[in-house]
Amino acid sequence: MRVVSGIQPTGDLHLGNLLGAILRWVRMQDEAAPTDQHLFFLADLHALTVEVDPAQLRANIREMAAALIASGIDPDRSILFQQSAVREHAELAWVLQCTARMGWLNRMTQFKDKSGKNKEGASVGLFAYPVLQAADVLLYQATHVPVGDDQKQHIELARDIALKFNNDFETELFTVPEPFIGGGTAARVMSLRDGSAKMSKSDPSDMSRINLTDSDEAIAQKIRKARTDPEPMPSEPAGLDGRPEAKNLVGIYAAVTGGTIESVLADHHGQGFGSFKPALTDALVALIAPLRRRLVELRGDGAEIDRILAAGADKARVLAAPTIVEAYRVLGLTR
């Protein structure tokens, strides 16, 4: 099995990033068979689809790399690298744009969500970035791609592109990847102030999220003030229906402690959230405090972060080279 996945270097990482992607990667790495390979990359080319500050982007790349390592990604067991350091990503993306169909991209719901009412002002990169995502995984002959529900459509696009290319040029060049979806009860962590909105760094209220750099005291304050409702904890998951804030806190506790929604409710049903929140705070502090300390250490050694990313890029290029060389040969191109 070869797993490939990327994350944009956004900076200001929060609990949603940790539970939604990073810890899933760590579990996959730690549970891997000896023959499995895992490639995790910082998707800095994807970050260019919106306006960027180059200096901030460079800082965010190091920050994200440090956070991944602090969370448990081991560069000796997984290949960790910066997307733009492997030029084959961009090369293959252009090749695949010539295979992908406009109708396929027009159906991508994330472009509609991200461009909003300003579709005419959105960049071409934002429209076409699912093709770059396809290149990211097809380049390495990925067999499995861990994605959230909101990204499943893009993996289906990658499969369609791989199948069309293989069929058009009578080749078996590209492995058709399988999506690996889910994994954890809090894959979608919601805002602490609005249970219907995802936890996000773009929310103007810092009280809406748990940052990975938050102190123990800040975590306690945010959970204490997190929005809930006056009803007690139910005994069954169905009792959380129509209670998004309650469901969010229960889901976070389950994910952080390795339990399930059912087990959390079995232990805490009948309690008010005033009694439940201290337990949630303790669980979050136990998870984040050691990660935060390790992150601070890594921040102080930028040269080591750069070395790890460079070594990872060297390994990634070795795996990428056969695919791009064969793609050019099949197309009649010279490289």
Where on the chain are the PLM-derived regions?
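N-terminal Rossmann-like or analogous alpha/beta NTP/dinucleotide-binding catalytic cores
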Residues: 2-135, 283, 296
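Short, solvent-exposed beta-strand edge segments and adjacent coil->beta transition regions
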Residues: 10, 142, 205-207
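Conserved nucleotide- and phosphate/pyrophosphate-binding catalytic cores
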Residues: 15, 153, 159-335
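An acidic site on a long C-lobe helix of protein kinase domains
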Residues: 60, 88, 153-154, 245
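A generic secondary-structure signal for well-formed alpha-helical elements
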Residues: 65, 72, 100-103, 142, ...
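Short helix-capping/linker segments at secondary-structure and domain boundaries
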Residues: 102-106, 139-146, 254-264, 292
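Internal, conserved structured core segments that host functional sites
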Residues: 116-165, 169, 191
